[in-house]
Every structure is written in structure tokens, then in C-alpha cells.
Amino acid sequence: MMNASCSPNTQNSIDSDWVCRVRAVRKISKGEEITDTYVSTMANTLYRRRQLKALKYFDCGCKRCADPTELGSHFSTLLCRIKNCGGFLLCRDPLVSSSPWACLKCGAEVDGEQVKREQEQWEERVEAAPRLIPDQEKLLAALKQLFHPNHNLCMDVMFNLAPLYGVRGSKAEDLVSEAEKKEKMCGELLSTMEQVIPGGFRMRGMLLVERHTTKLFLLRTQLETKQCSKSTFVRNVASLRAPLAEAVKILGLEPPGSLESARLVQAEKYLAQVDSIVENAGKTLLPAGTE
């Protein structure tokens, strides 16, 4: 086994010949430990350490697990239960599962076992919730009453919601509103991921493509409804190239036949389209159906 970290600097993939390939997802300095993860990096500390203990038989003490804020991401942070406080509850010692949680603002404490039970109950609710926009939005609103908006349970629901927005079958008048929500959600997910797992992870590549299609749809809508000039449209489309090129670079490292490699084909098509629009100085509008 490679050394474990919940914010690893490598990622592996297994190809059709069952060869496991490990690659760096960010620069690894000389002498720096090379690490991998054995649990979902998009889970909170309580869940990750519980799973690692049960399945891999060790107590993780990595930098992320030891930090109550999870590297500043607040991936585990709760909201204070004292009415009108508005403070954040952090675990006093994340490496001790029964450790109490304390509010940074008022100092109120909550028993660690109570927090564990509460989170497990909400994990079950998130898992069981219907994958429909109204149900997921209602669940997200409820979670944000108890957890920091960056908490992994909120992130999980956002991952569920984002693909539901703007799908075929949505009412025409809802498409723009849903696209705006989707773009904002993708941005929030990418920002939080950059804190807990910085680097070229496949999940980042997939999200960058998802956000690109949404941004492209919104820009096209602005042009068609005369909310922007052609020159502004072209300039804004040009700004989409860098993140899309990053996605192509990330997904290009995934094995053939994988979901990510299929997404790569789409990303390359979108990249060529962006280049064509910019090169033609906005004279050619986007082909139909590219949203």
C-alpha cells in the first residue's frame, strides 16, 4: 500500500488489461511523501476515518484529518445549535471520534457522539432522497440550516443536483434559471475541491466540462436575446478556453473506454468550437444543440 492521505498528490486508474497506473495530480517536490487515498476524498473526516478503520484497519492522522477546518474548507463544520448565534462548530480533536465540538463564536459545546449520530442520520437521508430537483433542493435547504454550506453533505446534494438542471424536458422558461443555478453550483464545487484535493483529479476535469456547457448556453442565450454585443460574446467565449483546455489535459490521461474518456471526446469538440468562434471573430454563431 502507498502511504495514505485524504488530500493525496496522486491518483490511480485501472485500464482494460487490469494494469494500475499511478500519476501525480500536482507537483511533488523532491523528498516529499508520495500519497494516495483509500476512501472517498469528498467525505467528511468522521466518515473517512470510520471507513478507513473498518476497511483498512488504520486510524488516519493525515494533515487534513488532523485539521478541524479540513484545510480551511469547512468540509466537516456544523452550525452552532444556539439560537441566533450563527457561529461554526468545530471538533476540538478530530483524531478522537468522541471529542466534543465547540462553537468558535459562543463557546457552546456539543457531545461528539451526538454529532456522529446526527451525521449518520443525515447521510442516510441524503442517500435515500429521490433524485428529483424539488426533493434535492428541499434537502439542500434543510442541510444548510445545520451544516456549513461547504459541508460534504451539502456538496453531495449539489453533485446530485447539478446534472439535473437544464436537462431535456425542462420547461423553456426554466432553462436559463436552472443553468444559472448549475453554473453557480459547479463553481462552488470546484472551489471547495481545490481546497481539499487541489490538482488535476478526474472529478475536476468532469466538472470543468459540465460548467463549460452551462456557461456556453448562457452566453449564447445572452447573444440571442441581445443582452450582449457580438464582440462581448466572442470575448466571453474566449475566456472559456483555459478551463476547457485544462479539462482536456486531465481527462486525456484516463484509460480508453472509461466514462472520463467519453467526456474527453466531448471536451475536445467544445474546445475546437471555442477556437472556431474566436478565429471567426463572432461571425459564426454556435451550431444548434451545443448546449
Regions found by a protein language model. Give the residues of each.
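C-terminal SET catalytic tail plus cysteine-rich post-SET Zn-binding segment of SAM-dependent SET-domain
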Residues: 4-143, 149
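Amphipathic alpha-helical repeat scaffolds of TPR domains
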Residues: 115-141, 150-171, 202-223, 265-277
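Helix-turn-helix repeat elements of alpha-solenoid scaffolds
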Residues: 127-139, 175-188, 236-244
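Amphipathic alpha-helical segments of tetratricopeptide repeats
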Residues: 140-145, 163, 184-194, 245-252
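Helix N-cap/loop-to-helix boundary motif
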Residues: 144-158, 172-176, 194-205, 230, ...
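Acidic, serine/threonine/proline-rich low-complexity intrinsically disordered regions
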Residues: 167-183, 221-238
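Eukaryote-biased recognition of C-terminal alpha-helical segments
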Residues: 213, 248-291
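TPR/TPR-like (Sel1-like) alpha-helical repeat modules
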Residues: 232-255
